[in-house]
Each structure stands twice: as structure tokens, then as C-alpha cells.
């Protein structure tokens, strides 16, 4: 409440916060500031402060597991769609946990750490926070190797991305060039950029088909928030879910893209 980006200090006379959204990051993923709405805690006491205009209803949606779906898309070339099938019809984290020999909770943490380019130390600590740095590095290296072995086609995908990134760039889902700082970040950049491209296409398709009373409130990474009159709520929710699927189809993804839309009076009720 006292910092430069304190919400009340950034609140306008219209009782709104107009945050800044940039798409100029290295991975073309959206970045948020003044304030960073992506860092608003998920707790109800914080999210309920963000409300719909009186007489309007908030409608919002998140892309469902977009990072894992992008991984499934790129793996399909090497695993024949196995990862995508388990992701959609089974429990991918439990399958990997059984293969690696760690808990489902730990393998889920390891999965996202791996996808976001974490080093061996961080991966080791994600399994056991009590480890020393050296032991965490050794444990992380072991878990990383087991994780790669557990997922059919992942080793081949990593090698292909590493080879392509040797030139300094890789291509995103829409063909744009992504400049890669180092080869070990290449897969992370590929998945993050392609997920961002899907999110923006989702936003575009939704915007082109909005119900008469609807207008946008926020775009935060893989989340869209709108408000509309009560009579347009169901149409808007349907549109958000349909547009997500169409965004994936637009780029001929090897796995369907999905979103779950909710409505309510505050951000706490729709996210």
C-alpha cells in the first residue's frame, strides 16, 4: 500500500487501474507493470478488490495448461501424440511420477521448473529443500535425466531445438524468429513464445466477436477478463471457450487448446 506501484496510488478518479501491458519481451510473452497484475495474490482478500462496473458482470477465462499443451504439440512429431493423449485423457504428472520414483506433487513442480529453464540446483531443491547446494545440484542432475528419460521423444526434441538454436534463433509456432541467449534456454523460449502467440490469437478472435455490451478489462499472460450485461454473460463465456479452441486450430496444433470460462461480481469469483 506504500510502494510506487501501490494499487490505491494507481487508481484513477474513475476507480480503475490502467496497468501497462508490453509484448516486447525476448519471448514475445506479455509483460505487465504499473502495477504487475500477474503478481496479484490469488487469495480472495486481494482478488475481490477488483470488481465489475455496477450493473455489469465479470467474465474471465484461462487457457488450460497451455505450457504442457505446447510441449505436447512439439513432442507429437517424436512420440506419435502419446504425451498429448495422456495429458487429455489421463494424469500426466502421476504417469511421470511413477516412472521417476518421486511424488506427483514433486514431479509437477519439477515439470514446470524444467520447462522454465531451471538449473540442476533449483530442480534438486524442488524435490528436497533441505539439500546443500552441492547435493541439490547432484540430485537435480539425477532428476533431470530421469525426467527426460520418462517422456518419450523429449530427448529428441531437446536435441532438435538445441541444434536449431545454435544459429542464435529458433522459430515460434507462427514462424517468427526468437532470439535465444543460450542453448539451454531454447526449449523454454520456444514453449513460452508459442504459448504467448496462442494467447494473443485467442484475444484477437475473442475481440472480433464480442457481444454488444462486452468490453475488455485485462489480458494477463494466458488469462482474459471482460465485463458485460447479464443478458450477454452466457454468450461471452461460450465465446471465450470457443475462441481458445479456434486459436489452436488457427496454427494447426497437434493438440486442442481449451479454456474454462467463469462469471461473477469480482476477480476472485472468476479466476
Where are these regions (language model features)?
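Catalytic palm subdomain of template-directed nucleic-acid polymerases
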Residues: 121-131, 224-240
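Short, basic interhelical loop/turn and adjoining N-cap
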Residues: 127-142
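Acidic, glycine-rich two-metal-ion catalytic cores of nucleic acid-processing enzymes
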Residues: 1-101, 160-223, 237-246
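Short alpha-helical scaffolding segments that buttress acidic/His motifs in well-ordered protein cores
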Residues: 71, 107-115, 147, 191, ...
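Catalytic palm active-site di-aspartate
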Residues: 60-63, 111, 120-123, 215-229, ...
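Generic alpha-helical secondary structure
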Residues: 120, 136, 140, 154, ...
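Polymerase palm active-site segment centered on the conserved acidic dipeptide of motif C
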Residues: 147-159, 231-271
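Short, well-ordered loop/turn and helix-capping segments at boundaries between secondary-structure elements
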Residues: 72-80, 116-120, 129, 149, ...
